[in-house]
Amino acid sequence: MFRIVKWLIALPVGIFIFFNAYVYGNIITYRAVAPHRTAFMSMRMKQFEQEGRDVALDYRWVPYNRISTNLKKALIASEDVRFAGHGGFDWGGIQNAIRRNRNSGEVKAGGSTISQQLAKNLFLNESRNYLRKGEEAAITAMMEAVTDKNRIFELYLNSIEWHYGVFGAEAASRYFYKKPAADLTKQQAAKLTALVPAPLYYADHPKSKRLRNKTNIVLRRMGSAELPESDTD
């Protein structure tokens, strides 16, 4: 009996250690090499296949300096205004999310920073529970410890979902505007950023009033967004 209990404890611990060792190795690799595809992309494409959707993956990696400053500022203004200065976690946002989750009785809000969103996109699935949030936090801490802010942002910009099968700034810019991501205007960058929280909903509701309102909010805020200090774009 004791041996069974021992194995029941050791097995999940071993899996946890192995997974995090795998993740850390990939984080080191991604400091210099672009991901072939992310865990979130794979999950999403499998979901589309199960739903009977004929969707092809459109994912085009481009370097940081070939993405418009307008899009960078718009995303920071909307998704993580303190990105340049924090260590991966916005503690005020996390506290607010905990309060909202406690009031709702389930995990709905995450208070996620750009770094946390990237951790999820690269390695995790879309489930919402405290165990997954804990793993997300561990991955975020590892990533922030060994990866500079520009590289984190570059990985994020290239892995965001924007439409059915459309991932990354370059694919999104060419899908919506038939131009490279380097040439996005402020209005176009704000519109793309407004799609980020719910890209598939807006794919099905492109004339949503909520989308127009969010675009205008991003436009007003993006001028004051602070990019990472080493940004030379």
UniProtKB/Swiss-Prot annotation:
Name of the coding gene: mtgA
Gene3D superfamilies membership: Biosynthetic peptidoglycan transglycosylase-like
Protein name, as recorded: Biosynthetic peptidoglycan transglycosylase
One cellular-component annotation, GO: peptidoglycan-based cell wall
Catalysed reactions, semicolon-separated: [GlcNAc-(1->4)-Mur2Ac(oyl-L-Ala-gamma-D-Glu-L-Lys-D-Ala-D-Ala)](n)-di-trans,octa-cis-undecaprenyl diphosphate + beta-D-GlcNAc-(1->4)-Mur2Ac(oyl-L-Ala-gamma-D-Glu-L-Lys-D-Ala-D-Ala)-di-trans,octa-cis-undecaprenyl diphosphate = [GlcNAc-(1->4)-Mur2Ac(oyl-L-Ala-gamma-D-Glu-L-Lys-D-Ala-D-Ala)](n+1)-di-trans,octa-cis-undecaprenyl diphosphate + di-trans,octa-cis-undecaprenyl diphosphate + H(+)
Alphabetically ordered keywords of this record: Cell inner membrane, Cell membrane, Cell shape, Cell wall biogenesis/degradation, Glycosyltransferase, Membrane, Peptidoglycan synthesis, Transferase, Transmembrane, Transmembrane helix
Domain of life: Bacteria
Function, as annotated: Peptidoglycan polymerase that catalyzes glycan chain elongation from lipid-linked precursors.
Cell wall biogenesis/degradation listed as a keyword: yes
Gene source species: Neisseria gonorrhoeae (strain NCCP11945)
Primary location group: membrane
Topology in the lipid bilayer: Single-pass membrane protein
Membrane-spanning intervals of the chain: 8-28
Similarity comment text for this entry: Belongs to the glycosyltransferase 51 family.
EC main group: transferase
